[in-house]
Amino acid sequence: MTDKIRTLQGRVTSDKMEKSIVVAIERFVKHPIYGKFIKRTTKLHVHDENNECGIGDVVIIRECRPLSKTKSWTLVRVVEKAIL
């Protein structure tokens, strides 16, 4: 069996933890009755080994084995640094 590793792109919302960041993933969901597309956000805890991310950065993450109670994603790369 060939399992594809899940990768997602999102924006960093918190970098206060040591070697961890919180990434917000935005997706659009169609309302079942009215048909309007609604923006939904999911927050994921991500392992950042080198503490290279800051708030507002756009990053690519991939799924991995559970690293803690809430962390099961790791940082692949920073796509765009935030303008501060």
From Swiss-Prot:
Alphabetized InterPro entries for the sequence: NA-bd_OB-fold, Ribosomal_uS17, Ribosomal_uS17_bact/chlr, Ribosomal_uS17_CS
Keyword Ribonucleoprotein listed: yes
A Gene Ontology biological process term: translation
GO cellular component terms, A-Z: cytosolic small ribosomal subunit
Keywords, comma-separated and alphabetical: Ribonucleoprotein, Ribosomal protein, RNA-binding, rRNA-binding
PROSITE patterns reported in the protein's UniProt record: RIBOSOMAL_S17
Molecular function GO terms recorded: rRNA binding; structural constituent of ribosome
Pfam family, one: Ribosomal_S17
Domain of life, source organism: Bacteria
Family: Belongs to the universal ribosomal protein uS17 family.
Subunit structure: Part of the 30S ribosomal subunit.
Role: One of the primary rRNA binding proteins, it binds specifically to the 5'-end of 16S ribosomal RNA.
Protein name: Small ribosomal subunit protein uS17
